[in-house]
Amino acid sequence: MTKEVIVESFELDHTIVKAPYVRLISEEFGPKGDVITNFDVRLVQPNQNSIETAGLHTIEHLLAKLIRQRIDGMIDCSPFGCRTGFHLIMWGEHSSTEIAKVIKSSLEEIADGISWEDVPGTTIESCGNYKDHSLFAAKEWAKLILSQGISDQAFERHLV
């Protein structure tokens, strides 16, 4: 018999969310009391827009560095297959507001303060698809996302 599972992201009604936002998906508690928080970092409106792979790939590499510079406990930040944002997995309890501020600050640096030399993991040795990057696209997307504001709520706009 196959175990029945529910994947939260497939239960989310993508037609009523209002991107850009940060949403707490879940807090998971380990057997020894460890807490892991999972966030939906939605940068563009689902089914209306998507970030092309080169820009998203560069944003991914930059967020891997910039988030860790701003907050402790980041485990992983991985892009959604639909290319509308990222899953952010963190050790410990964190609020959507706290994470939204970190994302906003990180995007501000991408938009205004990053040069190609600042992008980590862009060589054949350090990246599995090193030719598929675009700092230009990453900067343009960061500017567009910031112009719309980052919300700490998914279903109504509450900007941080």
Swiss-Prot record:
Pfam assignment, any one: LuxS
Single GO BP term: quorum sensing
Record-listed E.C. numbers: 4.4.1.21
Keywords: Autoinducer synthesis, Iron, Lyase, Metal-binding, Quorum sensing
Note on cofactor: Binds 1 Fe cation per subunit.
The keyword Lyase appears for this protein: yes
Binding annotation for Fe cation: 57, 61, 127
SUPFAM superfamilies xref list: LuxS/MPP-like metallohydrolase (SSF63411)
Reaction catalysis annotation: S-(5-deoxy-D-ribos-5-yl)-L-homocysteine = (S)-4,5-dihydroxypentane-2,3-dione + L-homocysteine
Leading EC class: lyase
One MF annotation (Gene Ontology) recorded for this entry: iron ion binding
Domain of life (superkingdom): Bacteria
Cofactor(s) needed: Fe cation
Assembly and oligomerization: Homodimer.
Protein purpose: Involved in the synthesis of autoinducer 2 (AI-2) which is secreted by bacteria and is used to communicate both the cell density and the metabolic potential of the environment. The regulation of gene expression in response to changes in cell density is called quorum sensing. Catalyzes the transformation of S-ribosylhomocysteine (RHC) to homocysteine (HC) and 4,5-dihydroxy-2,3-pentadione (DPD).
Membership in a protein family: Belongs to the LuxS family.
Name of the molecule in the record: S-ribosylhomocysteine lyase
